[in-house]
């Protein structure tokens, strides 16, 4: 039998896995249990009332978290001419065309988000095998293929997170760090839930936001009472 560490035992003693906590209590408890020696990520898992196997019920999008993510984001942009200058002015670390494509093909991917102007997609389209598995392929559904590259860069820098439902119908996302105040985590979570509601597929029937749980990188999940979410929205 695996011996549990002292830290894990403490976490398990504090969290009742069968209980639904109010949003405020859940966030405070997750922060309290995030005792690793680094600034743990605070994450959320949302079970959606959809059939993820059906193409008309895929939920995907992006949202700028009002309190940011607590992470420094390096942005690369495919653009030329005036749009390239706009991307640089907005704070993009890397801006290019064929030179950027060659860099990516060689395996040098020194960025967290990739944005593309629509007129560059002929080049970007050849990079799918490299970018796709890494979740970096630009897509208009999440605002990373856009003529307004400057705004896209600013959004990425400001704390935009992308979300996509997995095969089990669950959306996973980070809403901040342990060092964030509970009010900041709360505003980020509510912004994410609002974005998920806006992305609800017309084909989805019944309860849409079925279950919500928050956790830290090294901690256990804490289930959130739905009534407290509705009251906070």
Swiss-Prot record:
Q: Which InterPro entries match?
A: Ribosom_uL1_bac-type, Ribosomal_uL1, Ribosomal_uL1-like, Ribosomal_uL1/biogenesis, Ribosomal_uL1_3-a/b-sand, Ribosomal_uL1_CS
Q: Which UniProt keywords apply?
A: Repressor, Ribonucleoprotein, Ribosomal protein, RNA-binding, rRNA-binding, Translation regulation, tRNA-binding
Coiled-coil stretches noted in the UniProt entry, renumbered to this chain: none
Q: How does it assemble?
A: Part of the 50S ribosomal subunit.
Extract the PANTHER family matched here.
54S RIBOSOMAL PROTEIN L1, MITOCHONDRIAL, LARGE RIBOSOMAL SUBUNIT PROTEIN UL1M
Function (record text) = Binds directly to 23S rRNA. The L1 stalk is quite mobile in the ribosome, and is involved in E site tRNA release.
Give the protein name, as stated in the record. Answer: Large ribosomal subunit protein uL1
Native species: Polynucleobacter necessarius subsp. necessarius (strain STIR1)
Q: Which gene encodes it?
A: rplA
């Amino acid at each position: 039998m695996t011996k549990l560490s002292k830290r894990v035992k403490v976490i398990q003693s504090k969290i009742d896995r069968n209980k639904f906590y109010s949003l405020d209590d859940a966030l405070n408890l997750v922060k309290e249990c995030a005792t690793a020696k680094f600034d743990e990520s605070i994450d959320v898992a949302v079970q959606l009332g959809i059939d993820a196997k059906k193409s008309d019920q895929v939920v995907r999008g992006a949202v700028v978290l009002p309190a940011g993510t607590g992470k420094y984001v390096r942005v690369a942009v495919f653009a030329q001419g005036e749009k390239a200058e706009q991307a640089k002015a907005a704070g993009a670390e890397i801006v290019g065309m064929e030179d950027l494509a060659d860099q990516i093909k060689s395996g040098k991917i020194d960025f967290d988000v990739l944005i593309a102007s629509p007129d560059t997609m002929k080049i970007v389209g050849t990079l799918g095998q490299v970018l796709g598995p890494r979740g970096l392929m630009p897509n208009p559904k999440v605002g990373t293929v856009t003529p307004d590259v400057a705004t896209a860069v600013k959004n990425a820098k400001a704390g935009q997170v992308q979300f996509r439902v997995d095969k089990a119908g669950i959306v996973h996302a980070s809403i901040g760090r342990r060092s964030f105040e509970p009010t900041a985590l709360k505003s980020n979570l509510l912004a994410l839930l609002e974005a998920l509601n806006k992305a609800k597929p017309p084909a989805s029937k019944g309860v849409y936001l079925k279950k919500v749980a928050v956790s830290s990188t090294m901690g256990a999940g804490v289930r959130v009472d739905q009534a407290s979410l509705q009251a906070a929205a």
